[in-house]
Amino acid sequence: MDELLEKAKKVREAWDVLRNATTREKNKAIKKIAEKLDERRKEILEANRIDVEKARERGVKESLVDRLALNDKRIDEMIKACETVIGLKDPVGEVIDSWVREDGLRIARVRVPIGPIGIIYESRPNVTVETTILALKSGNTILLRGGSDALNSNKAIVSAIKEALKETEIPESSVEFIENTDRSLVLEMIRLREYLSLVIPRGGYGLISFVRDNATVPVLETGVGNCHIFVDESADLKKAVPVIINAKTQRPGTCNAAEKLLVHEKIAKEFLPVIVEELRKHGVEVRGCEKTREIVPDVVPATEDDWPTEYLDLIIAIKVVKNVDEAIEHIKKYSTGHSESILTENYSNAKKFVSEIDAAAVYVNASTRFTDGGQFGFGAEIGISTQRFHARGPVGLRELTTYKFVVLGNYHVRE
């Protein structure tokens, strides 16, 4: 039996135990995971160092190396995520609503785990921990398929996780990791309907579209982030600058980083030289439309290919627009439905923007970087969904459950 099928069967069998585990048992398992991550910190960081060195040897962009790299702070963040998830309310068993028919039949809608989940992701090893602890807390087993560039890091992390589970009531095989990096396994994995209840791809457009278009297992699509910030004519320009810098430069390789900046034409002459200079101080390559280049001639000319592109790098494209309506139309055309922001002091424009922009998260006077499970108070997230069905935005514990109807009768029969 090959590795994929063997491990898929294991997570399916383990789910029969995990879905009935108590909150105490699940929290104990997550606490043990946090302890093992700390105990085996040196081993994990050494494995990650090897991955990072190999990535740099291959000429991988530094913004993508940043997604791959671990350090003590990021290990601490993983441990903190474990502690946060332990403190979150267990959604399993929650009675969503209930009612009693006239004949006394009692009907309740009760939250239950989805089932074994397959996660296909690329270079971020912290995803291994975040997805695992959320899956366990919500009663779901997990089959992980990480990117080849993070193989050593992921093996070290999963080894620590499985060692932790051995010391708890939760089956060790509740978490399995596919070590074979053959890409053909992705296609096999997303068609394992017999064993997996859901597949979640986390990565770039190519991975997500491949999974969406080829899976027979239901897919929760985590989206590409071509995120925009629109600076309205009424915006406080002094306050706007740090918001834009934060959105673009804090973690440029993440899906909630701003990729496009739209500026109202009435403030363009005043604002563009300031923001371009500040972006460049932070190492950002600035591209711009013709109107932008009339004001700041030395920016790189933006082409049509720029507007739909998620750079995941220190690059931003700027477009001057006539008004909020043109900004909205531009975003409607090029948005991936992830996170969009308006900076404004005009209530009507803010209300219009929020109403007309179709995205998982729409912001008024805030950085797009807040679209994150931890920032939204969900603890760690398993991904950020840009689809409309089942879950949208950061996918936390509740979004990893479904429900069943529990019907209590007194030997009722239907008339």
Curated annotation (Swiss-Prot):
<dbReference type="InterPro" id="IPR020593">
    <property type="entry name" value="G-glutamylP_reductase_CS"/>
</dbReference>
<dbReference type="InterPro" id="IPR016162">
    <property type="entry name" value="Ald_DH_N"/>
</dbReference>
<dbReference type="InterPro" id="IPR000965">
    <property type="entry name" value="GPR_dom"/>
</dbReference>
<dbReference type="GO" id="GO:0005737">
    <property type="term" value="C:cytoplasm"/>
</dbReference>
<protein>
    <recommendedName>
        <fullName>Gamma-glutamyl phosphate reductase</fullName>
        <ecNumber>1.2.1.41</ecNumber>
    </recommendedName>
</protein>
<dbReference type="Pfam" id="PF00171">
    <property type="entry name" value="Aldedh"/>
</dbReference>
<dbReference type="GO" id="GO:0004350">
    <property type="term" value="F:glutamate-5-semialdehyde dehydrogenase activity"/>
</dbReference>
<dbReference type="InterPro" id="IPR016161">
    <property type="entry name" value="Ald_DH/histidinol_DH"/>
</dbReference>
<dbReference type="GO" id="GO:0050661">
    <property type="term" value="F:NADP binding"/>
</dbReference>
<comment type="function">
    <text>Catalyzes the NADPH-dependent reduction of L-glutamate 5-phosphate into L-glutamate 5-semialdehyde and phosphate. The product spontaneously undergoes cyclization to form 1-pyrroline-5-carboxylate.</text>
</comment>
<keyword id="KW-0521">NADP</keyword>
<dbReference type="GO" id="GO:0055129">
    <property type="term" value="P:L-proline biosynthetic process"/>
</dbReference>
<comment type="similarity">
    <text>Belongs to the gamma-glutamyl phosphate reductase family.</text>
</comment>
<dbReference type="InterPro" id="IPR012134">
    <property type="entry name" value="Glu-5-SA_DH"/>
</dbReference>
<keyword id="KW-0963">Cytoplasm</keyword>
<keyword id="KW-0641">Proline biosynthesis</keyword>
<comment type="pathway">
    <text>Amino-acid biosynthesis; L-proline biosynthesis; L-glutamate 5-semialdehyde from L-glutamate: step 2/2.</text>
</comment>
<keyword id="KW-0560">Oxidoreductase</keyword>
<dbReference type="InterPro" id="IPR016163">
    <property type="entry name" value="Ald_DH_C"/>
</dbReference>
<dbReference type="InterPro" id="IPR015590">
    <property type="entry name" value="Aldehyde_DH_dom"/>
</dbReference>
<keyword id="KW-0028">Amino-acid biosynthesis</keyword>
